[in-house]
Amino acid sequence: MSMTPREIVHELNRHIIGQDDAKRAVAIALRNRWRRMQLPEELRVEVTPKNILMIGPTGVGKTEIARRLAKLANAPFIKVEATKFTEVGYVGRDVESIIRDLADAALKLLREQEMTKVSHRAEDAAEERILDALLPPARMGFNEDAAPASDSNTRQLFRKRLREGQLDDKEIEIEVAEVSGVDISAPPGMEEMTSQLQNLFANMGKGKKKSRKLKVKEALKLVRDEEAGRLVNEEELKAKALEAVEQHGIVFIDEIDKVAKRGNSGGVDVSREGVQRDLLPLIEGCTVNTKLGMVKTDHILFIASGAFHLSKPSDLVPELQGRLPIRVELKALTPGDFERILSEPHASLTEQYRELLKTEGLGIEFQPDGIKRLAEIAWQVNEKTENIGARRLHTLLERLLEEVSFSAGDLAGAQNGEVIKIDADYVNSHLGELAQNEDLSRYIL
């Protein structure tokens, strides 16, 4: 990951509108990870990541920034809600399961990467196994010299037909590895024991083969995955995954404000202060036992976020505040932001709806005045009712295009190739009354 902070922000701008301060903070944090890896070993261990606290109302891009960042970094990433956890000793998930889940995510990410690397070799091996199943063994006859040449020609002919997809629907009998996955359900907090039991059952069935009747297309995919799995060195993979978690892992903790003590409320709440106390060693740096081995959390980047409507960041326990040194405030969205969200990002909402309806042969075109009016209504409804940020646009667009989506097939024939123009008048006729009536907009929009 050698992108500069400016390049990271530029990439984030393709998907997220506004919130420049938050983008700059996460871009610097990500770049610092690369800078740290360039340092000598003795200095590298001393440099710890500066964890981030994002403060801002719902629907302004907190989660999306973290999600896009992880994708850019190609790093193990996990998003969790702080409200899902309870203090150690109580029924519920304990915070160490965050690192176990991150380890699983890292293993999955690296396995996919390794399997992509060996895909060509796996493809060739799978092809040979399918051809072996398609063609009977060579028969020994009087003219033994002619038989191999004839078999080779037949094999090449079948190989050509297989690659062209002519044999996809032909049924064959082939030996494949037996899937020995055992689904074990356990109460919250017992994830580690469940994982160990699943691994035990998986190892018991390792190497067992089972003869199955499958269509060539299905068999080819199954055998390809099996061959790729065989080519991947599991021990090496686990070692790489362990390093990826420790050096590049990113944990996004949402709804951190919900575990803050509100105002002067007395008593200790299991789901609040206890969770904060349990998070402290995790963020500061501790060792957690996972299926990859012992994971040190010293260099994992933690990004916490919350709306802080009913509480303040200062309501978090002081030690946790100290472990989230970088604070970024995300601003509430304006009508102008809504307008840009509808038109500027890569795969914007308007583009998604346009392409969805195009699959039925129906063309729709969002006019600039229509987008502007839609943005104004979204902002108005957020102001009058609950402010849910950009998520309001999903509700409005679904309502706006409900009739068009329902009758798309019929309209496509009736329009004769003409596009439906979504302008300000169209928006007003479908949403104007609902937006003006506060009681209706509260329950419908």
From Swiss-Prot:
What name does UniProt use for this protein?
ATP-dependent protease ATPase subunit HslU
**Listed SMART domains:** AAA, ClpB_D2-small
Q: What is the lineage of its organism?
A: Bacteria, Pseudomonadati, Pseudomonadota, Gammaproteobacteria, Pseudomonadales
Q: Which domain of life is it from?
A: Bacteria
Write one Pfam family the protein is assigned to.
AAA_2
Subcellular location per UniProt equals: Cytoplasm
The organism of origin for this protein: Pseudomonas fluorescens (strain SBW25)
What this protein is reported to do is described as: ATPase subunit of a proteasome-like degradation complex; this subunit has chaperone activity. The binding of ATP and its subsequent hydrolysis by HslU are essential for unfolding of protein substrates subsequently hydrolyzed by HslV. HslU recognizes the N-terminal part of its protein substrates and unfolds these before they are guided to HslV for hydrolysis.
Q: Which residues bind ATP?
A: 17, 59-64, 254, 319, 391
List the keywords (alphabetical). Answer: ATP-binding, Chaperone, Cytoplasm, Nucleotide-binding
